[in-house]
């Protein structure tokens, strides 16, 4: 697989019209519930750096990106009225300081009535005439950009749209497969760089080069962690210095295709040693969790299944002693594995709606003692979730068990052995099916 053929443009073009019809149906229902006639979706505006004269990297409104593969286009408006062709007000600023967006082109243009404007003031004449009949979706920090529409992000409509976004169309799934293939290229390059003894910073650069992204185009900041840095869940640095001894490498990094993300984690041992054996065993554990994914399964139950498997592995590895339920109840598994099993994935890496019980906004809380579980819903066909168990030496969490039965269950000598390796996390992106799942990540690595 090469970067120039990760995207199947023909498949995307074939699926896109049905995707737009699905979005129309969702927005028809949302407008009816909100008692409105038109929805206006703002792509977003750049945000200025405090006390400076330049902007932060632009991040688009995910509702806009769900309609259009335009992730770098501020000041655009999508206007949809049921029964009518969607209107795209396409902002093409006349500017010699920055390169304006290219004229609209691609497989998507035939689905829209495209109106190119060169000044923000020209947007208004392409919007519905009665703002009281409109709802506006977007991050509006300048009232002028609302063009008189007062109903901004109404909960009645937003809850319905957010709940529905968890289920992916064929077009969205194809984008995510391509994002997985792109991400796999980066992960292969990163492993090669690790084996060659490169620094975290150098590995990060090799990853970006392999996926064809600038740092700002990544779906999230790459986690590139050598040795003990792998114990920091969202390790945010890329050290220029090489460690005196290379032991382990944890990389959590994704890629984008037309706004849709992959979110992939792998862990590698430098030597063929006991840690390498533990990583292999953990890979088996992760795949056993993937095998439990299917429509109708409560994701919170999967999360607790993971804790039971982690408890067994802790005993097998000599890191703890005790019965499975006792290790969970005493907080031992949470000390080694403090995060959730996974989350919804899509345009947003932590896609919206993971704790929604229905399309009215009912919240499903995570199980007691597991506050960081981002997905608590019953799984449905064509959702895409991450399955990302972890095992880490996080001293502050182990220290919190001092004076409790859980502290005595831990073999602290064995923990000292594992500490220099940091931790293990393995993460796949998995599509939910009626009788099982499609593993987008493993398929991408096999391509």
Predicted features and spans:
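Active-site neighborhoods and metal-handling regions in enzymes and metal-associated proteins
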Residues: 1-447
């Amino acid at each position: 697989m090469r970067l120039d053929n990760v995207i199947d443009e023909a498949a995307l073009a074939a699926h896109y019209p049905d995707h737009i019809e699905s979005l129309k149906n969702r927005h028809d229902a949302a407008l009816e519930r909100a008692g409105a006639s038109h929805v206006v979706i703002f792509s977003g505006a750049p945000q200025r750096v405090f006390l400076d004269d330049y902007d932060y990297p632009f991040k688009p409104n995910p509702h806009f990106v769900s309609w259009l593969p335009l992730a770098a286009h501020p000041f655009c408006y999508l206007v949809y009225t049921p029964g009518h062709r969607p209107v795209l007000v396409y902002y093409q600023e006349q500017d010699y300081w920055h390169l304006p967006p290219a004229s609209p082109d691609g497989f998507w243009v035939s689905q829209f009535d495209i109106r190119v404007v060169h000044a923000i003031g020209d947007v208004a004449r392409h919007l519905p005439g009665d703002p009281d009949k409109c709802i506006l979706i977007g991050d509006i920090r300048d009232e002028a950009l609302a063009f008189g529409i007062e109903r901004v992000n109404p909960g009645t409509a937003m809850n319905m749209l957010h709940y529905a976004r968890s289920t992916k169309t064929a077009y969205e799934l194809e984008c995510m497969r391509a994002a997985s293939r792109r991400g796999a290229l980066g992960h292969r390059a990163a492993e090669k760089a690790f084996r060659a003894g490169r620094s975290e910073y150098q590995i990060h650069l090799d990853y970006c080069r392999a996926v064809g992204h600038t740092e700002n185009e990544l779906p999230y900041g790459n986690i590139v962690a050598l040795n003990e840095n792998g114990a920091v869940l969202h390790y945010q640095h890329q050290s220029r210095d090489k460690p005196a001894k290379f032991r382990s490498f944890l990389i959590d990094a994704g890629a984008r295709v037309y706004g849709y993300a992959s979110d992939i984690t792998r862990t590698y041992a430098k030597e063929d040693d006991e840690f390498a054996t533990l990583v292999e065993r953990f890979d088996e554990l992760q795949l056993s969790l993937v095998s439990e994914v299917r429509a109708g399964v409560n994701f919170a139950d999967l999360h607790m299944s993971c804790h039971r498997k982690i408890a067994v592995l802790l005993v097998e590895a000599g890191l703890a002693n005790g019965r499975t339920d006792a290790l969970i109840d005493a907080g031992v598994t949470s000390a080694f594995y403090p995060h959730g099993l996974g989350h919804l994935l899509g345009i947003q890496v932590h896609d919206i709606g993971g704790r929604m019980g229905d399309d009215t906004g009912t919240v499903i809380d995570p199980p007691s003692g597991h506050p960081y579980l981002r997905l608590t819903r019953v799984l449905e066909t064509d959702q895409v979730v991450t399955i990302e168990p972890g095992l880490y030496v996080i001293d502050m969490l182990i220290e919190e068990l001092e004076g409790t039965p859980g502290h005595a269950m831990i073999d602290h000598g064995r923990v000292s052995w594992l500490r220099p390796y940091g931790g293990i996390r393995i993460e796949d992106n998995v599509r939910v099916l009626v009788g099982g799942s499609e593993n987008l990540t493993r398929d991408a690595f096999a391509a």
